[in-house]
């Protein structure tokens, strides 16, 4: 574990991570749930540093069924996703709290919006640097490297500083 920067607190069977566990990844994402042969297996939840979470049924390390909940309580629905689509452009906070008066536009779900560093994009869970193709959370901690599809989506869709 010390080699990867991860931490495991849980049961072992024959020297392998198995049973109920808490697994802390180097990104500070935390898995709480069942393990089998060193993999997520059974019911378990990933808790992300942003405050969002993914509850799933896992099979040999792969999520076979799950639900994602954003930090503001919005649930992602793969089949009937109508949040901020072509028909209803309201942010979740506007759905919960109503629209602002005319002339007081809301630019992001967070109001007032975060200040974006020059040349970066706000991609919802952090700031994206298009030169390094790295997304860091709002506390400047590494989240991920963006692939070509995510890079294209962010630069086409997200607010730029």
Swiss-Prot record:
Q: Where are the MORN repeats?
A: 8-30, 31-53, 54-75
Question: Where does it sit, as one GO cellular component term?
Answer: sperm flagellum
Its keywords, alphabetically, are:
Cell projection, Cilium, Flagellum, Repeat
> Which gene is annotated as encoding this protein in its UniProt record?
MORN5
Q: Spell out the Gene3D superfamilies in the cross-references.
A: Histone H3 K4-specific methyltransferase SET7/9 N-terminal domain (2.20.110.10)
SUPFAM superfamilies from the entry?
Histone H3 K4-specific methyltransferase SET7/9 N-terminal domain
Q: What is the lineage of its organism?
A: Eukaryota, Metazoa, Chordata, Craniata, Vertebrata
- Tell me where on the tree of life, at the top rank, the source sits: Eukaryota
List the protein's name: MORN repeat-containing protein 5
The tissues in which it is expressed are: Expressed in sperm (at protein level).
Q: Write down the PANTHER family for this protein, in alphabetical order.
A: MORN REPEAT-CONTAINING PROTEIN 5
What InterPro entries does its record include? Answer: MORN, Morn5
Subcellular location field = Cell projection, Cilium, Flagellum
């Amino acid at each position: 574990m010390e080699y990867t920067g991860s931490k495991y607190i849980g049961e072992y069977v024959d020297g392998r991570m198995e049973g109920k566990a808490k697994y802390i990844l180097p990104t500070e994402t935390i898995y709480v749930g069942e393990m089998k042969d060193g993999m997520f297996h059974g019911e378990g939840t990933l808790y992300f540093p942003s405050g969002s979470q993914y509850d799933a049924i896992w099979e040999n390390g792969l999520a076979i069924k799950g639900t994602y909940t954003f930090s503001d309580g919005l649930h992602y629905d793969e089949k009937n996703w109508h949040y901020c689509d072509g028909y209803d452009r309201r942010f979740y906070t506007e759905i919960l709290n109503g629209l602002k008066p005319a002339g007081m536009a809301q630019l992001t779900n967070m109001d007032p919006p975060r200040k974006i560093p020059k040349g970066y994009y706000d991609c919802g869970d952090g700031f994206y640097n298009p030169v390094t193709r790295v997304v860091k959370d709002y506390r400047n901690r590494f989240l991920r490297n963006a692939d070509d599809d995510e890079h294209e989506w962010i630069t086409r869709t997200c607010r730029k500083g």
